[in-house]
């Protein structure tokens, strides 16, 4: 019996060291060398180096002077990130969308873009389509006392056009740039 147990324990120990220690350290080392920013969470910092957030996780922005992210079913908490899981026929979904649309609606701007009233699959999507950011530009410019053209140009300069997929605007990066503007 011990003849069979010894090789099994040796295999367990060796495989545990390889898969639990050596491989993770190797992958972490390669990631730190090849992609240091991404390996450390794609963090966004202010001028003093203070971490304000990650490019990968949405944050809640209250107030008329900020661009708003997509709604979050989990109130932007990473621990409880999830979709709302409400069926299209659920009255609670219709009520929430109507409430969010009323909050985001800007006179004479047409219908509120869908991205501003619907949650993403994770509830933490940090990006908006450019048209959703442009829709908010008038509200933000008015609240901050800035020329609309300046705010629209800021949205355009923060529009990312990936090789594959639609153009997007990272709301945290956009709001950081907005905070740096003189009123």
UniProtKB/Swiss-Prot annotation:
Q: Name one GO cellular component term.
A: plasma membrane
Key word Transcription present: no
Keyword Translocase (UniProt): no
Q: How does it sit in the membrane?
A: Single-pass membrane protein
The protein's matches in InterPro entries, at most eight in alphabetical order, are given as:
KdpC (IPR003820)
Where are the bilayer-spanning segments?
10-30
> Which keywords are on file for this protein?
ATP-binding, Cell inner membrane, Cell membrane, Ion transport, Membrane, Nucleotide-binding, Potassium, Potassium transport, Transmembrane, Transmembrane helix, Transport
Record's superkingdom? Bacteria
GO molecular function of the protein, one example?
P-type potassium transmembrane transporter activity
Q: Name one Pfam family in it.
A: KdpC
Q: What does the UniProt entry say about where the protein is found?
A: Cell inner membrane
Known partners and oligomeric status: The system is composed of three essential subunits: KdpA, KdpB and KdpC.
Q: Which family does it belong to?
A: Belongs to the KdpC family.
Protein's job = Part of the high-affinity ATP-driven potassium transport (or Kdp) system, which catalyzes the hydrolysis of ATP coupled with the electrogenic transport of potassium into the cytoplasm. This subunit acts as a catalytic chaperone that increases the ATP-binding affinity of the ATP-hydrolyzing subunit KdpB by the formation of a transient KdpB/KdpC/ATP ternary complex.
The name on file for this protein is Potassium-transporting ATPase KdpC subunit
In its UniProt entry, the species of origin is given as Pseudomonas aeruginosa (strain LESB58)
- According to the entry, what is the taxonomic lineage of the organism? Bacteria, Pseudomonadati, Pseudomonadota, Gammaproteobacteria, Pseudomonadales
């Amino acid at each position: 019996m011990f003849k069979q147990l010894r090789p099994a324990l040796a295999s367990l120990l060796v495989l545990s060291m390889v898969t639990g220690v050596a491989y993770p350290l190797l992958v972490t080392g390669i990631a730190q060398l090849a992609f240091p920013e991404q390996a450390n969470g794609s963090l966004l910092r202010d001028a003093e180096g203070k971490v304000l957030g990650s490019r990968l996780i949405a944050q809640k922005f209250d107030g008329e002077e900020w661009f708003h992210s997509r709604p979050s079913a989990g109130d932007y908490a990473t621990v409880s990130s999830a979709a709302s899981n409400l069926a299209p026929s659920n009255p609670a979904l219709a009520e929430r969308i109507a409430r969010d649309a009323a909050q985001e609606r800007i006179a004479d701007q047409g219908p509120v873009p869908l991205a501003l009233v619907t949650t993403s699959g994770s509830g933490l999507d940090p990006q908006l389509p450019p048209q959703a950011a442009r829709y908010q530009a008038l509200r933000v410019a008015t609240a901050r006392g800035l020329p609309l053209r300046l705010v629209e140009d800021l949205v355009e300069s923060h529009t990312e056009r990936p090789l594959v997929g639609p153009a997007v605007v990272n709301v945290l990066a956009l709001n950081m740039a907005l905070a740096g503007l003189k009123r």
